[in-house]
């Protein structure tokens, strides 16, 4: 149990997708203007990561890995296309659910919801799972931990950006300029976790 808690904390803080690996920055910067929208996207990314990583773990270990289907047959060259297909299918299912049951959030996310399918944070989580050879329970913990870490980062950024509306920011830094600086400072804060051994 301690191993899974350690993996979860490492995925949320030490190896944060947004602030340690800078994955998913396009949606991170574009949707982090309001806390409500950022938290909605954060939940959507957490759900997709939490499902995509373990499902792709099963696909990789049962179908694509060397000798998984037939001894001596290695289908791992199909990793990327298969992982992208699974992620795209999950995003489509999530999009249909949000459209039917949460139309306000669906409209607030707009074009960024389909872009979750090509969000590099999700593909990065799946790639790290394969690279680190996580088993199925580890992939569940890592997927949800990575999603919660990304959601923590985007909600914190949205809260800071809402407060910065009332700050006296120099004209040349307004908009994305101060957002990039703030993201860098947040990343420096998360770097303090890098020495933690779990």
Curated annotation (Swiss-Prot):
Keywords: Cell inner membrane, Cell membrane, Ion transport, Membrane, NAD, Sodium, Sodium transport, Translocase, Transmembrane, Transmembrane helix, Transport, Ubiquinone. It is a multi-pass membrane protein. One of its GO terms (molecular function) is oxidoreductase activity, acting on NAD(P)H, quinone or similar compound as acceptor. The keyword Zinc-finger does not apply. Its EC number is 7.2.1.1. One of its GO terms (biological process) is sodium ion transport. PANTHER family: INTEGRAL MEMBRANE PROTEIN OF SOXR-REDUCING COMPLEX, NA(+)-TRANSLOCATING NADH-QUINONE REDUCTASE SUBUNIT E. Belongs to the NqrDE/RnfAE family. Composed of six subunits; NqrA, NqrB, NqrC, NqrD, NqrE and NqrF. This is Na(+)-translocating NADH-quinone reductase subunit E. It comes from Klebsiella pneumoniae subsp. pneumoniae (strain ATCC 700721 / MGH 78578). The gene is nqrE.
